Amino acid sequence: GLPLYHLHEIFEDVRTLAGYAAGEIQLESLKLLPGTEMRRRAEELGIKYSPLPPYEVLQTHEISVSELQTARQLSRLLDGFYNTPAWQTLTRELILNDEQFLHRFLAYLTKANLIDQPMSLEKRGLILYEFCKQNYPEYQIQAAIAWIEAGMSLKKLPAEKVWTKRQIPPATWNIIYGEYKESLR
């Protein structure tokens, strides 16, 4: 809700931060606290805000109520997927390789009424995998690998191509010896 700041710039800034491999991306709504310069200049700057705590910006000349709602939902998406180590690498790649990914994934989560639901790590992994399967099949294997690396069940859909039953080790093992390095811990 900053003055002169548009919704498309928020999406651009998220892509820029993802490009820098930011560890986390936090989007929060602007609050106009009593006694601050921004609050004193709110009318001049075209900022409408809640008169009740936490005094959140509701609208500006540049960003509508519905666009601020989209920004809030984008924050939820980032918290659930980008800011979660298990899904961060895949989410970052999708953000960087397709300018429309955030818009598409947000629309997908919103249409499924999931954007405001609390979701377990497993549920988020299932959603991301299914979304990739439907919309980005070239990332399906990467989603499955992220699922397995996160320690999720091999009996669930993302691990569907992993063989776990009746697997017999080879008659002869190819043993590879190497040197232990403390940095491998």
Language model: regions and residue ranges:
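A structural motif corresponding to the C-terminal lobe/cap of the Radical SAM core domain
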Residues: 1-99
